[in-house]
From Swiss-Prot:
Homodimer. It comes from Sulfurisphaera tokodaii (strain DSM 16993 / JCM 10545 / NBRC 100140 / 7). It is an enzyme of class 2 (transferase). Its main location: cytoplasm. It holds the Pfam family Aminotran_1_2. Keywords: Aminotransferase, Cytoplasm, Pyridoxal phosphate, Transferase. Belongs to the class-I pyridoxal-phosphate-dependent aminotransferase family. This is Aspartate aminotransferase. L-aspartate binds at residues 42, 179, 372. One of its GO terms (biological process) is amino acid metabolic process. The modification N6-(pyridoxal phosphate)lysine is found at residue 240.
Length: 399
């Protein structure tokens, strides 16, 4: 059999992701010598906090380098449960599994429930991996278009969501705060979504990885519902909040029976999360002072990016309330320049050395008139990058 005769599952994945544009940027920097301003990266630009690094080093020096339980170490599971219980409804250690990154947590959740032909409702736009994994498992992504208004941002469009729930619907995916839009959804909307999910007897997979990145308003977590065990699969992790993207640690919270089944799957896929990384994560909970400082810094950066984007003619932008992304509408510019959003992003890299992520990466249709910019970069780079972006757009608009 030819080595390139891949499975249906493998062939169902497109491979289009934010990383493609990072590769283009690296090539441009190498060949043209342009200093890249990277608004495409989806991670904090700060190093992992010192006490976390030191805890991991200490565990290495003490020889904590073997396998752990597939569930993760008990101390970390307990600390996660205590932390969430202090904010929301009660969570027990037995209702937590630690995973190698939040993406793995999402994969376990989909793998546990999705059979071929099952439908999964995903808001459009959304993080691209949701739909890719659903397709890989033979499921069918069903998209609900979010509504955009420059003054109020994006809303969930729950009436359309209700109309798309049928006997094949297995799950609804929620991401709050939201990538790529930077929205923190109205708590009333989230409450209504939770009610719909329970009423229709479908699962709610809630990805709350950006839960500390909130600049205005209040976020409502699905774990605030006393009945969360009946329908919620909750995903979070350490990558964003503690600037630990390369450490690859996430976790799932769900009913104990669900966690047990996930652990069985985990033991046969990756055995366990990295031992010494878990010791580092345990130290993360000792203080949130650095987190608060980072959020304050990112809020200032957000304000700068918003004000600079507002100066560009033809752009509509809502000031994001959460995560670390701005998602401006550039549909008028694309139309006048006769460009797709993908071509816009590629040309912006090639000609000005500025990396953005075209909204079409976040399927399916809504994003085709938007680009995503991360403000997890230095203030001077934000100003310089938006200046270059304005020059590029002015050039496109010149007859």
């Amino acid at each position: 059999m030819p080595v390139d005769d891949f499975s249906l599952s493998a062939n169902s994945i497109s491979g289009e992701s934010t990383l493609v544009y990072q590769d283009v940027a690296r090539q441009v920097q190498k060949t043209k010598g342009i200093r890249i301003i990277n608004f495409g990266i989806g991670q904090p630009d700060l190093p992992t906090f010192a006490r976390i690094r030191e805890a991991a080093k200490k565990s290495l020096d003490e020889g904590f380098t073997g396998y752990t339980s597939a569930y993760g170490i008990d101390e970390l599971r307990q600390k996660i449960a205590e932390h969430l219980s202090s904010k929301y409804e009660s969570v027990r250690k037995e209702e937590v599994i630690v995973t190698p990154g939040a993406k793995t947590a999402l994969y376990l959740a989909f793998l546990l429930y999705i059979n071929p032909g099952d439908e999964v409702i995903i808001f459009d736009p959304s993080f691209y991996s949701y739909a890719e994994v659903v397709k890989m498992l033979g499921g069918v992504p069903v998209y609900v278009k979010m509504k955009f208004n420059e003054s109020t941002g994006f809303s969930l469009n729950l009436s359309e969501l209700e109309s798309k729930i049928n006997k094949k619907t297995k799950m609804i995916v929620l991401n709050n705060p939201h990538n790529p839009t930077g929205m923190v959804f109205d708590p009333i909307e989230i409450e209504k979504l939770m009610e719909i999910t329970k009423e229709k007897k479908v699962l709610l997979l809630s990805d709350e990885i950006y839960d500390y990145f909130i600049y205005e308003g209040k976020m409502k977590s699905v774990l605030e519902d006393p009945d969360w065990r009946d329908y919620v699969i909750y995903v979070n992790g350490f990558s964003k909040t503690f600037s630990m993207t390369g450490w690859r640690l996430g976790y799932v919270v769900a009913k104990e029976k669900v966690i047990k089944k996930m652990a069985e799957i985990a033991a046969n896929i990756y055995t366990c999360p990295t031992s010494f990384a878990q010791k580092g994560a345990l130290a993360a909970f000792e203080s949130f002072d650095e987190v608060k400082e980072m959020i304050s810094l990112f809020k200032k950066r957000r304000d700068i990016m918003y004000e600079e984007l507002k100066k560009i003619k033809g752009i509509q932008v809502h000031k994001s309330q959460g995560a670390f992304y701005m998602f401006p509408f550039i549909g008028e510019i694309l139309k006048k320049a006769n460009l797709s959003v993908k071509d816009f992003s590629l040309k912006l890299i090639e000609e000005k050395g500025v990396t953005t992520i075209p909204g079409e990466v976040f399927p399916l249709e809504v994003g085709k008139d938007f680009v995503r910019l991360s403000f997890a970069v230095k203030e001077d780079d934000i100003r310089e990058g938006i200046k270059r972006m304005k020059e590029f757009i002015d050039m496109l608009m010149t007859p």
